[in-house]
Each structure stands twice: as C-alpha cells, then as structure tokens.
Amino acid sequence: MRLVTLAPAKVNLVLRVGPVRADGYHDLRTLMVPLDLGDRVDVRVSPRRGPVRCTVPGRPELDGPENLAARAAEAFRRRFGVDRAVSIRIEKRTPVTAGLGGGSSDAAAVLRCLARALRVRDGAALAALALEIGSDVPFFLGPGPAWAAGRGERLSRAEVPPLDLVLVYPADPSLAIRAGDAYRWLDEARASGSQAPRRLGRPGRWRPTLLGNDLQAPCVARKPALQALLGLLVGAGATAAIMSGSGPTVFGIFPGRGAARGAALAIQGRAKGGAAGVQVLLARTVRRHPRVSPWRSPRSASSRSTRRSSRPT
C-alpha cells in the first residue's frame, strides 16, 4: 500500500516555559497551530519483510535511519510487531531546524500513514509512541490548533481563526539555534535575574494579546540579527511579530492575504538588496491537519482531470 499526506509546518502563537524539571525537560504551556505549507510525505508499505528506507530528494544529508521520520517508522514497527518493509520519500519544503516542527511533523505523518495502512486504531498507543519520538510529535497527530502542556503531551483543542502570516527564516548558519541551547539560554537568563520567570497560566480562548514566546529574548540577546528580522516584519505592516518555537524563524501576523503577500514581496526585495540570506514564506493557519490519501500517479490524476473537463456544462 502506498499513501501520501502533507506534513504541515507549525508556529507557536504562545510559548510559556516553566522551570527545568528533574528529568531535564521544562513544563510548557504553548498554543500551536498548523499551517497550509509543509513537506509532502510518501509512505509505501510492502507486503514483504524488509528494512525501513528514507530518502529526501535534493537533501542527501537528511537521508537514512537518523531522519526522525525513519525513526518513527522503526518505533512503530517495534511497538506493533511489524516486520514489513517501509519506504519513505519526503519532498522537503519546510526549512530544517527552523522552529517550525518540520521533522516532528514528518514523523507524525509517517505514523498516521502506517496506522492507516496497517489498520492500527489504538490512538492512545500512537500518542505515547509519538511522545517517545519527540515533544512536538503528539501535536501533529491531533486534530488541529491546540494548547499543549507538560512536555507537549497534554493537548486541548483550541479555536483559532485563520491568520495570514509571513515567515522569515534566516539561512545564515551563524543564526542557527539548537532547541537545547535556546532553553539553556533561558535558564541562564533567569538564574542571573535578567529575565523573570512567568506563570504558565491556563489555556484559554486565543486573542492577539496572548502572543508571546519566552525563548525569544534570550535568543535575540545572542543573535541580535533576529531583532532586525522582526523589525522587517513590523515595518512591512505586521500587526505583531515574534519568533516561532526555539527559532530562528520569525513570523508576522497580517490583516489579510493581500497585505501578507505584499509584505512578503517587499521583504524579499529588501533581502535581494542586501538583507542577509533569508527565506520568505507566505502561510495561513488551518483548522485541521491534512488527511492521509492513497497515492495516485500523475498520469491517473491527469486522466481524471481530462475526463472532468470533457463533460458537458
């Protein structure tokens, strides 16, 4: 069986971070929303026994067993006693290590595809498996926008209206941020007294005044160029702009699709004129994760389109 789905990127509209726990993780309260952009994940399950293979065309450094999607497939096979060969192909569109959840979303997409292909309906077991793979993975198994608590495993549905966004990802390797470093910088800032800890608060109805990210200040302190990117977004008309997750991607909220498109073009123009290498992405939040669908060849899709267009109107 061969299945395909979109592995959507996400942004954090709210990210509140509690003190470090005994297990080394932090308690979180975060509002995550999926976007209408992401990676295309193609999963083929063979009737025969065999290994897990994962390829990312054009990104050979992401091929192989260390890819989170491949690790998700291996974990699924162990948990549910499956030895059938699995082939994963990822068309990568979400920037890597960008604070947009690309790897976690790919992993969740693989779990969803395998669950459908192999008729696994134990949602609780899948959720537990997702948390073992990564803190953000359970969110991508859920129905859509959600408040997440704990490490990210306690999810509650959130109502978020469609938001038009412009994302700016700095391609400069010197601006890359590892998630572990972002949390460590926050702990150090709090220990020094330069950043006071916040109460995590309770999940509630989304409103723009909630927008915030506890990791932003310590990351900007070490990567001041991020502040310039936030300024680009506000200067282009964003009603608000923050960093997503552990960065380094920043995003702005715009009053409509047209305003967002114009801002994206303006920022791209600034980038060509000298603003350091950045990737500018236009996105909109969505209310549910994409469905898993059977794979169809481009030829069959084209023939269906031709049949539809030839019908009398």
From Swiss-Prot:
InterPro entries assigned to the protein according to its UniProt record, in alphabetical order: GHMP_kinase_C_dom, GHMP_kinase_C_sf, GHMP_kinase_N_dom, IspE, Ribosomal_Su5_D2-typ_SF, Ribsml_uS5_D2-typ_fold_subgr
Location of region: Disordered: 289-313
Signal sequence segment: none
Biological process, per Gene Ontology: isopentenyl diphosphate biosynthetic process, methylerythritol 4-phosphate pathway; terpenoid biosynthetic process
UniProt keyword Glycosyltransferase present: no
Pathways per UniProt: Isoprenoid biosynthesis; isopentenyl diphosphate biosynthesis via DXP pathway; isopentenyl diphosphate from 1-deoxy-D-xylulose 5-phosphate: step 3/6
Catalytic site positions: 10, 136
Ligand binding (ATP): 95-105
Name the record gives this protein: 4-diphosphocytidyl-2-C-methyl-D-erythritol kinase
Organism: Anaeromyxobacter dehalogenans (strain 2CP-1 / ATCC BAA-258)
Lineage, highest ranks first: Bacteria, Pseudomonadati, Myxococcota, Myxococcia, Myxococcales
